[in-house]
């Protein structure tokens, strides 16, 4: 528990200073500033942001969802496109709902344009694909899908959010397990 608190504190102070939209990176900073769905969703879902930064991160997360974003090929995708990548997908809906943005989370879930969870369903899928570009109307199966499963968990992680937030099935931390 002490190690967790030490690491969490170090991340907050080392990587997440006070919010300032005009702050430029320091010469000693390493890495890149990221303005992506995953860069906000993951730390929000894990509770990494402090009380000062969390509302700003949430505002930026909502912005990354409600605006058009360019994909890896530079093609502009419409608002409410799922642009989290493999790792951020499991965190985005929970990050939104945990911070009172249920309508944004539902909007993201119910979008049918590419790339989204329901795009594959609208195109005949009966399971969750490993890659959002497994099949597209524009490219058929000709996209970057050499390593691909048409029944995969990663993008299906939204199901946990659906159980807890759509169906209301919540765990009771005081009484875990089935009774």
Residue ranges and their predicted role:
Residues 1-179:
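Active-site core of glycosidic bond-cleaving carbohydrate-active enzymes
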């Amino acid at each position: 528990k002490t190690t967790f608190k030490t690491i969490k504190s170090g991340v907050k102070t080392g990587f997440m200073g006070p919010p300032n939209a005009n702050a430029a990176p320091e010469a000693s900073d390493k890495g890149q500033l990221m303005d992506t769905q995953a860069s906000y969703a993951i730390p929000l879902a894990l509770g990494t942001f402090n009380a000062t930064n969390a509302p700003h991160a949430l505002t930026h997360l909502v912005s990354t969802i409600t605006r058009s974003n360019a994909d890896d090929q530079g093609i502009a995708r419409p608002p409410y496109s799922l642009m989290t990548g493999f790792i951020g997908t499991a965190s985005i809906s929970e990050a939104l709902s945990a911070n009172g943005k249920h309508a944004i989370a539902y909007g993201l879930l119910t979008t049918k344009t590419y790339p989204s969870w329901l795009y594959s369903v609208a195109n005949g899928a009966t399971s969750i694909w490993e890659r959002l570009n497994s099949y597209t109307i524009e490219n058929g199966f000709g996209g970057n899908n050499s390593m691909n499963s048409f029944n995969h968990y990663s993008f299906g992680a939204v199901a946990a959010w659906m159980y807890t937030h759509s169906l209301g099935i919540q765990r009771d931390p005081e009484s875990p397990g089935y009774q």
